Amino acid sequence: MIGFNALGHLGRLGNQMFQFAALKGIARNRGYQYCIPPSQMQGEWKDHHQYYNAVGTGAAQHQLLQPFKLQNTNQLNLQFIDADRPVVQEGSFTFNEDLFNNCPDWVTIQGFFQTEKYFKHIRDEIKGDFEFKDEISSPCKDMMAEIDEPVSLHIRRTDYISNPNHSALGLEYYEKALRTFDKRSTIVVFSDDPDWCNEQELFASDRFLVAEENSAYVDMC
């Protein structure tokens, strides 16, 4: 069995999805069982301290159990790898073929694993794992059914504005992207800063709908 004890301490929901999928893909390729920690997280990610304050306490703070059915995951898959077991690092932001093909058993892997090469052989199963729970997907489907040929526009601002490792894209980027779509399309704007979006002239016309839920789960769904 291999695990990912640091799940939830290395990024938000998107990162956690890559990490889970890679863990499962590596385990399947090697013929192992896999496990992720049970999570104590309540609500959605709002502050990085929710993650990092739990490091070293034996508490997990990942989000995967909240929005997704994880229908191929059972109780055996919800546990920590023993703390005295080796930690195997990804090593870089590129595909680690050696780790994929030669990962030892009874270790916890660690990294970002941001490539589908780790899990493309179990693509359909991963898609099933990441099916949203009905309480999230049902209202989203109802809303989108009322919009003819919608286009989703996602704008991340809050943490990117102050993070020196990232940058918030300017309005000219979105304006250029929108030119590739039919001007009659309805644009649904999802953002962690909906108030800012509502203030922008670019999104003022009737073809734009700014989602007010401010929920990462609803926005992704």
Residue map of PLM features:
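N-terminal pre-catalytic "stem/leader" segment of glycosyltransferase-like enzymes
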Residues: 1-44
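Short amphipathic alpha-helical segments and their helix-coil junctions
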Residues: 1-7, 135-140, 205-206
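Aromatic-acidic/polar surface patches that form glycan- and anion
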Residues: 8-16, 163-170, 216
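Donor-binding and catalytic core of enzymes assembling or modifying cell-surface/extracellular glycoconjugates
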Residues: 13, 181-221
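Structural alpha-beta junctions
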Residues: 28-33, 71, 75, 176-185, ...
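Short beta-strand segments
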Residues: 36-38, 154-155, 186-191
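Short, charged/polar "capping" segments at the starts of alpha-helices
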Residues: 41-46, 161, 193-199
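Secretory-pathway luminal glycosyltransferase catalytic domains
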Residues: 44-183
